């Protein structure tokens, strides 16, 4: 009878429990080896695991994150690869500045967002991703009266930097990585995320009608606290 044996290089990093070996803080690399077992009492299979610590530089950094997260999210949610084309625009450099000192929002194909045109195709309650400040994926919010909200919501999860999709059915943002949840305004309602999603001001240019994002430095109206992202 043969068995599969895996040698642990760092046994102290393994966590054991009733359901077997597990540990959320490490990655397990399985390397099977074949051995011959003798004797009537040696029945069954014996398994150990080689554990490898996750390097610190692989933990998403809020200051260095890439908008590629958005592309990957689209790959999970769209039914065909051909439909991924619009998401390529989020890999271009951050949107151009405006005369007011903010950043002009860009849509999924890289065009500047014009408020009147946007509202023709986005219904009340809609939350759709655009490219915002520093190139971050940012939600434009359409109010019940068919106007744009004066705030926009940064889509980057405050836990480990995943892009958080909006769940229309539950009317909340739910992170696909570790289950963090935020209400429809981006306020955290369930961990492990420690903080609410960042905000940006959403203005409309008087002359050209383009949507402009401006850094939010005032009190967070959702929590009454100073903005952690400023």
UniProtKB/Swiss-Prot annotation:
Assembly, in brief, is: The 4 large subunits of the cytochrome b6-f complex are cytochrome b6, subunit IV (17 kDa polypeptide, petD), cytochrome f and the Rieske protein, while the 4 small subunits are petG, petL, petM and petN. The complex functions as a dimer.
Enzyme class at the top of the EC tree: translocase
GO MF annotations, alphabetized: 2 iron, 2 sulfur cluster binding; metal ion binding; plastoquinol--plastocyanin reductase activity
Q: How does the UniProt record describe the way this protein sits in the membrane?
A: Single-pass membrane protein
Q: What keyword terms does UniProt attach to this protein? A: 2Fe-2S, Chloroplast, Disulfide bond, Electron transport, Iron, Iron-sulfur, Membrane, Metal-binding, Plastid, Thylakoid, Transit peptide, Translocase, Transmembrane, Transmembrane helix, Transport
Pfam families noted in UniProt = Rieske, TM_PetC
Q: What is this protein called?
A: Cytochrome b6-f complex iron-sulfur subunit, chloroplastic
Origin organism is Pisum sativum
Indicate the segments forming the Rieske domain, all copies: 115-213
What job does this protein perform?
Answer: Component of the cytochrome b6-f complex, which mediates electron transfer between photosystem II (PSII) and photosystem I (PSI), cyclic electron flow around PSI, and state transitions.
Also noted in the record is: This protein is 1 of 2 subunits of the cytochrome b6-f complex that are encoded in the nucleus.
Transit peptide: first to last position: 1-50
The record lists the catalysed reaction(s) as: 2 oxidized [plastocyanin] + a plastoquinol + 2 H(+)(in) = 2 reduced [plastocyanin] + a plastoquinone + 4 H(+)(out)
Give the EC number.
7.1.1.6
- Give the matching CDD domains: Rieske_cytochrome_b6f (cd03471)
Cofactor dependence: [2Fe-2S] cluster
Principal localization? plastid
The annotation note on the cofactor reads: Binds 1 [2Fe-2S] cluster per subunit.
Q: List the disulfide bonds.
A: 162-177
Q: Where does [2Fe-2S] cluster bind?
A: 157, 159, 175, 178
